[in-house]
Every structure is written in C-alpha cells, then in structure tokens.
C-alpha cells in the first residue's frame, strides 16, 4: 500500500470516528500518523535524479509574492497589469505551464511577482504540477490567492486545504509551544496557560507516535493537537495570504459586498482595471516593508535609494539597518541620529535597539568620528539643542 492510499485510509477512519471525550486520544494519534505520512510524501524518492523542469527562479528585489489559484482565474492578466511582463492569457485552462516572474515598482521598492501554473485538487499528492507550485509558494513572503468571484466558495477551501497539507499555514502565527528533544530524562510536560484541546496524556501519546521518549514540552497558550504536531514536525511555513476575488464585473453588487467583507480579502476586476491600486497598497501593508534613508555626515539624506527592511524577515531596528549597510558598522557605531515618526524629537540620539518606521532618516556616528570631532560635531545639526554635547563626567563627591 502506497503513502497516498494509507493517508486516505486514515482520513476515512477519522471520518467514521465520532468526536467525543472517549475518542479524542485515538483521533490525536491518527492526526500524528497523517502528519508523518505527508512529510514522507514530500520527501524526494531515494536515488532520484535532478532531471525535470522546476519552477524556482532567482529571488530579486525586496520581497516575493506568489500568485496561487485554479486555472483560468486571471493570474496571468493580473501579472501583466501590475508588472508589464507579458504572460500568456487565454480563455482555456492551463495556459501558463511554467513560472513567469515580473517586478512591481512601488514606493521606491522592487517586489517580485510570480505567476504560477494553476493547481488542481489533489496537488499536494502530486497531481498536475502542484508540488512544484507549492514549493515556490513556500519561498514567498506573501501569497495572493486569486479566486473567481463567479465560482463557488468551495474553491477557497480546496486551495487552503491543499496548501496546509504541505505545511503552509496561511494567516497564522507560530504556536507558543516550547519543544526540545533530550537524550535522557523522559518527557517533561509543563504549561503556563489552561489547556482545553490537549492534555498531558494525549501529548505523551503523540510523542510516542513519533518515537520520542525524552523531551521537554512547555505550552504557553491554549494550543490544539494540530499546533503541537506542527511544532514537532518543525517544517511549517507561516505566511500571510490575501484572497483576491477577480471578475467582480460579472456578479451582482450584493455578492461583491459580501466578498469584500470577508477577512483578508479584496475584490478586483482585471477586465475593468478596478481596485488594482488598492491591491498594491494592501500588498505593501501585508509585507511589512520599511524604507529607511541614510544621511551621511554633513550632507543631505539620500532619498533616491532607500534601505528596505522588513518587520517579518529580520527586523526594523538600527542594528538591522547597520547590517544592511555593512556588517562591520555595528561594531564601529557610537550612536545613531534618527529623524522620523519613530522618535520623540528630531533628531534623536538612539542605540542599536531603536525601532525604525517607514521613511525614517538615519545617520550613523562612528566611534572614530566622535573621538576626532569632539563637541563641534553637533553644531552642524540645526535642530539639535546646544546642550546636546556630551557633559564631562565628574568625580563622585567624597562622603
């Protein structure tokens, strides 16, 4: 019996089993078995060659967005309108057979947009080219799930199920569960929050299913069995997703209003070029990109080439800015002068941990510059008060 058949057999058993207090331990074990089998399904077969065409393209720009959806929902047309890159579009299905990249120039940043082939139900099991499509989606910073507003709402659930089957968690955050394997000592189970979905006994059974007999487990929130399995697997990708309903020009106003009110959703029409500007703004907000401008000593800020940080990847602190400029700048920095909305006054003397916001201006003062320049360095800043110069340290008073 193959892996896919075993997964379907366990799913059928779960569907037959009534959910109650007496069967929750058995269902938890079945969920762990399915998670293990799906992980094996994604592993490449032993001895397989590297032949075959893949979809992976070189990352470019300050972020990557993947277009996911069923065939003929308007992904290629959307790519052409947002990037100017030509992607073959037609009225028949499976027009796009490979990954077509494009670049969006927005707010002085470059965002890579990938038009992926349409996926079908069963893509997580290898049908069509679903595995390759989903693998590229895992490397993206944001997923745009393009849906046909005139089709059934079931398409959204099918696509979400296929993505979650391969370890993608849409619009979720990693569960607050600490898990660490040990060589000896048995299983240590602790919790700092009341648990209503899982208990110590079920936790032990799931760990034994993975043949883990020595580990430390700490629940910091009311997590579920699926959350605990995700932590054990350790290969889940938590990614933001925006549900883009296209072709709203062929449905009624009531349907448009209903779809637009759904969480993480936006309605557009590629045919009428409707709401595309709001889609770009939504993409920008979801990706959490932050532009930071550098200001050399005694010069005007460079507003042409910002340093782009991300709140999701890495962070948005002065230390992150220094690492973007040069890896040795953190060691050489004395302090930073920051102008912008993240400070109480302009400029503000800040350290490495200062959080930066969009369009902040940063000037790094190095240790050598401060030692050589002395107090006169601060006189070049028109906004700095006269008392900003360092005060000499006085010896403590004698008792």
UniProtKB/Swiss-Prot annotation:
It is found in: Cytoplasmic vesicle; Cytoplasm. Residues 388-399 have a biased composition (Basic and acidic residues). Residues 367-399 are annotated as: Disordered. Residues 288-366 form the TGS domain. Coiled coil: none annotated. InterPro entries: Beta-grasp_dom_sf (IPR012675), DRG (IPR045001), G_OBG (IPR031167), GTP-bd (IPR006073), GTP-binding_2 (IPR031662), GTP1-OBG_CS (IPR006074), P-loop_NTPase (IPR027417), Small_GTP-bd (IPR005225). Expressed in actively growing tissues and reproductive organs. Mostly expressed in leaves, stems and siliques. Also present in flowers and flower buds, and, to a lower extent, in roots. The keyword Repressor does not apply. Residues 63-288 form the OBG-type G domain. One of its GO terms (cellular component) is nucleus. It comes from the Eukaryota. GTP binds at residues 69-76, 115-119, 246-249. Belongs to the TRAFAC class OBG-HflX-like GTPase superfamily. OBG GTPase family. This is Developmentally-regulated G-protein 1. It comes from Arabidopsis thaliana (Mouse-ear cress). The gene is DRG1.
């Amino acid at each position: 019996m193959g892996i896919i058949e075993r997964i379907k057999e366990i799913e059928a058993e779960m569907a037959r089993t009534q959910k109650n207090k007496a069967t929750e331990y058995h269902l938890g074990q079945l969920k762990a078995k399915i998670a293990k089998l799906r992980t094996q399904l994604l592993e490449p077969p032993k001895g397989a060659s590297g032949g075959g065409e893949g979809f992976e393209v070189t990352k470019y720009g300050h972020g990557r967005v993947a277009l996911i959806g069923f065939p003929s929902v308007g992904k290629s047309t959307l790519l052409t309108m947002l990037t100017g890159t030509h992607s073959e579009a037609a009225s028949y299905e499976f027009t796009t057979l490979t990954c077509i990249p494009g670049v969006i120039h927005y707010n002085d940043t470059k965002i890579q947009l990938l038009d992926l082939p349409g996926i079908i139900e069963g893509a997580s099991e290898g049908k069509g080219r679903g595995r390759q499509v989903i693998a590229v989606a895992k490397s993206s910073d944001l997923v745009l799930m393009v849906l046909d507003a005139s089709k059934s709402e079931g398409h959204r659930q099918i696509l979400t199920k296929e993505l979650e089957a391969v370890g993608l968690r849409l619009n979720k955050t990693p569960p607050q569960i600490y898990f660490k394997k040990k060589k000896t000592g048995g299983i240590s189970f602790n919790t700092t929050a009341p648990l209503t979905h899982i208990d110590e006994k079920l936790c032990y059974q799931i760990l034994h299913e993975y043949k883990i007999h020595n580990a430390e487990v700490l629940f910091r929130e009311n997590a579920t069995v699926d959350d605990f399995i995700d932590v054990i697997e350790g290969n889940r990708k938590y990614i933001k997703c925006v549900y883009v309903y296209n072709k709203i020009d062929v449905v009624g106003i009531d349907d448009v209003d209903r779809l637009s009110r759904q969480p993480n959703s936006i309605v557009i029409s590629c045919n009428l070029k409707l709401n595309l500007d709001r889609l770009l703004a939504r993409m920008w907000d979801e990706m959490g990109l932050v532009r930071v401008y550098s200001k050399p000593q005694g010069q005007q800020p460079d507003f042409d080439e910002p340093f782009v940080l991300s709140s999701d990847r890495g962070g948005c602190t002065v230390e992150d800015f220094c690492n973007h400029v040069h890896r040795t700048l953190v060691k050489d920095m004395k302090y930073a002068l920051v102008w912008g909305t993240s400070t109480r006054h302009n400029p503000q003397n800040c350290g490495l941990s200062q959080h930066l916001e969009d369009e902040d201006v940063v000037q790094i003062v190095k240790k050598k510059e401060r030692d050589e320049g002395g107090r006169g360095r601060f006189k070049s800043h028109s906004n700095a008060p006269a008392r900003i110069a360092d005060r000499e340290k006085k010896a403590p008073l004698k008792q």
